[in-house]
Amino acid sequence: MFRMLSSSFEDDPFFADSFLAHRESMRNMMRSFSEPLGRDLLSISDGRGRTHNRRERDDGEDSLTHADVNPFQTMDRMMANMRSGIQELQRNFGQLSMDPNGHSFCSSSVMTYSKVGDEPPKVFQASTQTRRAPGGVKETRKAMRDSDSGLERMAVGHHIHDRGHVIRKSKNNKTGDEEVNQEFINMNESDAHAFDDEWQNEVLKYKSIGRSGNTGMRSVGHEHPGSRELKRREKIHRNSAIESGRRSNVFVDKLNVKGSPVKITKK
């Protein structure tokens, strides 16, 4: 299951080293769990000084025992089918994201948690997000946290067609080491500021289009007779509530209640 969900992360250089180290740690932990149970479970005594010997069973019993173990194979087949479905979904989304005139958003994440004895829990988290807009505009976000090694990483990339500017930050909470790197794709470092402005302008252009479209939809809706009637009723209700509030204030003023303040103690 973990392999199925993390395959896309393992192929990414940003996550690859951390995933390999984490997987090896998980293997060692699972190996330590399986060692006490490594002997043949069918040779366990039945409590009366006798053992179950699989070889002494007839073919019918042996096939029955084989059938009892096969649910694990059923689970494997189910996971394989799930893996195929996810891969097909990723292929379809990949084709959709290549449309130069479309918007798309893709997000993937994986998390593992393990705790052995009195040791502190080990948490591993990784996530990646990709947003695309027409005109070759793209933003990528990646993050990873490993409590075992104390390492935290994040990367944010802005892209326009084949040009890109990626900023990566990393910090080791155990050693206190911090590092910041920048990557310039198909451009010089001196062009980074102008590229960032260009990327922001492209993003704002599509945001303004979205706002104008929503405003147009609201304007059309207000012209509908039902909307006008609903607006009129809301106005009447609002005026009635204001008038009622005024009367309540007058009534309170007439009461002219006097007294000493009471101190309230919160527990």
Curated annotation (Swiss-Prot):
Q: Which domain of life is it from?
A: Eukaryota
Location of region: Disordered: 39-67
**Disulphide-bonded residues:** none
Report, as the record phrases it, the tissue specificity of this protein: Highly expressed in skeletal muscle, heart, testis. Also found in lung, but not in spleen, thymus, bone marrow, liver and kidney.
Q: Its quaternary structure? A: Interacts with CENPU. Also interacts with NRBP1/MADM, YWHAZ/14-3-3-zeta and HNRPUL2/MANP. NRBP1 recruits a serine kinase which phosphorylates both itself and MLF1. Phosphorylated MLF1 then binds to YWHAZ and is retained in the cytoplasm. Retained in the nucleus by binding to HNRPUL2. Binds to COPS3/CSN3 which is required for suppression of COP1 and activation of p53.
Gene behind this chain? Mlf1
Q: Which family does it belong to?
A: Belongs to the MLF family.
- Per the record, which residues fall in region Interaction with COPS3? 50-125
Protein's cellular compartments: Cytoplasm; Nucleus; Cell projection, Cilium; Cytoplasm, Cytoskeleton, Cilium basal body
Entry's Pfam families?
Answer: Mlf1IP
Summary of the function given for this chain in its UniProt record:
Involved in lineage commitment of primary hemopoietic progenitors by restricting erythroid formation and enhancing myeloid formation. Interferes with erythropoietin-induced erythroid terminal differentiation by preventing cells from exiting the cell cycle through suppression of CDKN1B/p27Kip1 levels. Suppresses COP1 activity via CSN3 which activates p53 and induces cell cycle arrest. Binds DNA and affects the expression of a number of genes so may function as a transcription factor in the nucleus.
- Give the Gene Ontology MF terms in alphabetical order: DNA binding
Induction info reads: Expression is activated by FOXJ1.
Q: How is it modified after translation?
A: Phosphorylation is required for binding to YWHAZ.
> What PANTHER family is this protein classified in?
MYELOID LEUKEMIA FACTOR
Q: Which UniProt keywords apply?
A: Cell cycle, Cell projection, Cytoplasm, Cytoskeleton, Developmental protein, Differentiation, DNA-binding, Nucleus, Phosphoprotein
Put simply, this protein is called Myeloid leukemia factor 1
What Gene Ontology cellular-component terms does the record carry? ciliary basal body; ciliary base; cilium; cytoplasm; motile cilium; non-motile cilium; nucleus
InterPro entries listed in its UniProt record: Myeloid_leukemia_factor
The organism is Mus musculus
- Residues recorded with modification Phosphoserine: 6, 8, 32, 34
